[in-house]
Each structure stands twice: as structure tokens, then as C-alpha cells.
Amino acid sequence: MSEQQRVAIVTGAAGGIGRELVLGLLGKGLKVAAVDRTAQGLAEVAQAVQQRQQGANLMTIEADLTRDESIDEIVSKARGRFGMIDILVNNAGVGQATVRSDNRQHPIKFWEVSPEQWKLFVAVHTSAPMALSRALVPDMMHQKWGRIVNVTTSLGTMIREGSPTYGPSKAALEAFSAIMAKDLTGTGVTVNVLVPGGVTNTGMVPLEAGYDRAEMIQPAVMTPPLNWLVSDAAGGVTGRRFLAVHWDPSLPPEEAAAKAGAPVAWTEIATMPIEPPRRG
């Protein structure tokens, strides 16, 4: 199968990073099912794609990832339009501003988080990626080709004061990514993590945060590394995490990957637990 025949599902596709990922994959010639809960945002993405004369390769799916039923609906609709799903990009995110918009000035304490807020972050950042991956991986393994890219976050954000929901739920996805990569070793299905590498100019960072938007990382930095990670050329790359801001598009992709990459979950700096030998 040529790369142009492949199909990707991208969650959180209506704006910010997700929008750039969708446009980048379409620009590469892939077919994309763009998933988001925001109908207006999806319509704007579709309009931008039509202006680029790539509308035939895009479908939009309005779905709420906190609903268990949404997983089957997304997969069914995407397969109904495009057939086999080859690529999954778990990008959907919920920002700390949904808990409180002045979080940067007055960091949220963990005891201020309601059970409903906690469940929302875990559902979107951890449970939905697991459920979508579980639904799609059997077919990927059957065809001996698949790509899963999980958008987590930087270590500093995982443990930052004021991030008691966003950080832990993204950290769980990071750990899950490492396990996924090990489970899928030798199957032709790769699992990698891609993050911007810092505070990024998206709607998840409210104006109240006080940043100069022009000085923030721009979402478009995610496109070059993603396009390479979902290619045939990256078939031997799995269990890695990449900081898009350190990806140098002027270098050959393999060199850029070496510069911007590290093991998922920072296992190279971890002291692993002592495990005694097993009998038998």
C-alpha cells in the first residue's frame, strides 16, 4: 500500500495542535478522520481543507470522548468512509483553564479539584486513547502495519504546581505508551509520543496566563515530526518521545529524530526496580 492510500484518525482535531496535524497529514496525501466535540471548529477545519482542494480526503466526526459509546461510533464511521484505519493520533486534550482560568497566577491545589473534573481529564487524556487503540490495534497487527502517536506533555508540566489533573492524566498516557510499544514489538505497529516541548499557542492556554502569544511555541512545529513518524521510513522507530520544538526540518529526518528524541517515559534516567528470579 502506498502512503497516500493510508488513513488516519486524529482526535482533538478542531483547533490548535490538532488542526495543524490534520492539515499536515492531508498535505502528505493521507485520508483523515478528524474527531472533535466542537461542531463549529470541525466546520472551520473542513472549510480550510476545501480551500486547499483536499476535501475528498477529509471526514469530520463530532464526538464526546468522555462517552464510552463514542469510541465505537468513531471507529465505525471512519471505517465506513475510508475502510482500514492505519494511523491513530491521540491528541485530544482538556486544559487546566477548564478548572480555573487564572491557574497560572493562582495555581490550583489538588483538593480544589472536584471528582467530576478529575474524571473528565482522565477520560480524555487516558481512557479514550486506550479505548481507541484497543479498538484499532487488532486490524493493524493483522496487516502488519500501523502507527500510534500519543500527544502527552513535557515532564515539567506533568509535575508542575497547579497541574493536579492535566499532569497526572498525561503522565498516565506516557506510561501507557511505553507499555503499548513493548506489547506491539515485532508486529509492524509502532507507538511513539510527540509533544510540542513547551507552552504552546493554543486555546488551552487562556489569555489570563499573560504570555506573549508570539513568543510561545506555535502548533505548526508538530507537523514535520508527525509526518515522518507515520511514514514507512519510521517503521523501526517505536517507544520514543519527540519534542517537536527541537525537530530541525532542515536535517534529514533520521538526524532530526535523533536530536529531538528520547525513550518514552525517560527510562534512560530511571533506576529500575529489583526483581528476584522466578522459580520454574
Spans of model-derived segments:
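Active-site helix of classical SDR
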Residues: S133, S169
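Alpha-helical segment proximal to the catalytic Tyr-Lys
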Residues: P138, K182-D183
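Canonical Rossmann dinucleotide-binding motif of NAD(H)/NADP(H)-dependent dehydrogenases/reductases
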Residues: S2-A33
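C-terminal helical subdomain
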Residues: G186, V193-L194, Y211-G280
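Catalytic Tyr-X3-Lys loop
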Residues: V94, H106-M130, W145, V149, ...
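A glycine-rich helix->loop->beta "capping" turn
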Residues: E3-Q4, R52-N57, K77-N90, Q96-A97, ...
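The beta1-alpha1 cofactor-binding region of Rossmann-like NAD(H)/NADP(H)-dependent oxidoreductases
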Residues: A39-Q40, E62-E73, P115
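Conserved glycine-rich Rossmann-like NAD(P)H-binding loop of the short-chain dehydrogenase/reductase
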Residues: K28-E44
